[in-house]
Curated annotation (Swiss-Prot):
Disulfide bonds join 230-232, 263-266. GO terms for biological process: protein refolding. Under oxidizing conditions two disulfide bonds are formed involving the reactive cysteines. Under reducing conditions zinc is bound to the reactive cysteines and the protein is inactive. Belongs to the HSP33 family. The gene is hslO. Keywords: Chaperone, Cytoplasm, Disulfide bond, Redox-active center, Stress response, Zinc. It is found in: Cytoplasm. NCBIfam families: PRK00114.1 (NF001033). It comes from Escherichia coli O7:K1 (strain IAI39 / ExPEC). Its main location: cytoplasm. This is 33 kDa chaperonin. It holds the Pfam family HSP33.
């Protein structure tokens, strides 16, 4: 049966290696439900969601991570944003025809992966790696080796459970300031690579970990729920309107009678009429009509 969207952290007692396991279904469905994406794009967003959840769980502070693919292919952008509370949102932009069996490079074309880490306090960090690997997991493994010099492996699977999209993934990483033997890490990676999609998406995390590592000593920590959550708001839209030239705003009002701001992530609409705009310009809070 399908599992609740959760992330599990675990630690190998005899190796300086830590791991994570995440499965998502409801969160993925909510990201996809307001859009009519082709199946290959849905698959990429599913992989991005899993990857972002796994990467966000590596944060040692409050903040968020955005993982995005950009390129000159028919899928010009795919992005997932998540925070340390495992609250996720995402969107893709598609232009042109996409073959049913399109792989990552066909979708993105000449492109790159951008990882943006934004602490709640402190400076933002951004890393960029070229889309050189055949998979998103390979590109992110390259990112970890370049940016943090930490051997890292990601294992991402996508599929369907009870006819609904689902995805899961696992991460193995040598712990910082530890001297894990490469042979040990490779051994654990080889075990992890044997995980079947059906097992990862349908079995409880503890059973997955036992099947993979029953000959190892593994400590599993309390799970963390993963959920869809959009951070859009009427106030943020009002702040965005403040940055536009008055002439542009007035022109839209004259033509349409109101300004309709649409959130690509969740599908919400925020409507502003002439009175709302006047209040915004006077630094007052506009009324709060919202259309779903």
């Amino acid at each position: 049966m399908p599992q609740h969207d959760q992330l599990h952290r675990y630690l190998f007692e005899n190796f300086a290696v830590r791991g994570e396991l995440v499965t998502v279904s409801e969160t993925l469905q909510q990201i996809l439900e307001n859009h009519d994406y082709p199946q290959p794009v849905k698959n990429v967003l599913a992989e991005l969601l899993v990857a972002t959840s796994l990467l966000t769980a590596t944060l040692k502070f409050d903040g968020d991570i955005t993982v995005q693919l950009q390129g000159d292919g028919p899928m010009s952008l795919a992005v997932i944003n998540g925070n340390n509370n495992q609250q996720m949102r995402g969107v893709a932009r598609v232009q042109g025809e996409i073959p049913e069996n399109a792989d990552l490079k066909t979708l993105v074309g000449n492109g790159y992966v951008v990882i943006t880490i934004t602490p709640s306090e402190g400076e933002r960090y951004q890393g960029v790696v070229g889309l050189e690997g055949d998979t998103l997991a390979a590109c992110l493994e390259d990112y970890f080796m370049r940016s943090e010099q930490l051997p890292t492996r990601l294992f991402i699977r996508t599929g369907d459970v009870d006819g609904k999209p689902a995805a899961g993934g696992m991460l193995l990483q040598v712990m910082p300031a530890q001297n894990a033997q490469q042979d040990d890490f490779d051994h654990l990676a080889t075990l992890t690579e044997t995980i079947k999609t059906e097992e990862l998406l349908t079995l409880p995390a503890n059973e997955v970990l036992w099947r993979l590592y029953h000959e190892e000593e593994v400590t599993v920590y309390d799970p963390q729920d993963v959920e869809f959550k959009c951070t859009c708001s009427r106030e943020r839209c009002a702040d965005a309107l403040k940055t536009l030239p008055d002439e542009e705003v007035d022109s839209i009002l004259a033509e349409d009678g109101e300004i309709d701001m649409h959130c690509d992530y969740c599908g919400n609409h925020y409507l502003f009429n002439a009175m709302d705009i006047a209040e915004i310009r006077n630094n007052a809070s506009p009324a709060d009509p919202q259309v779903h």
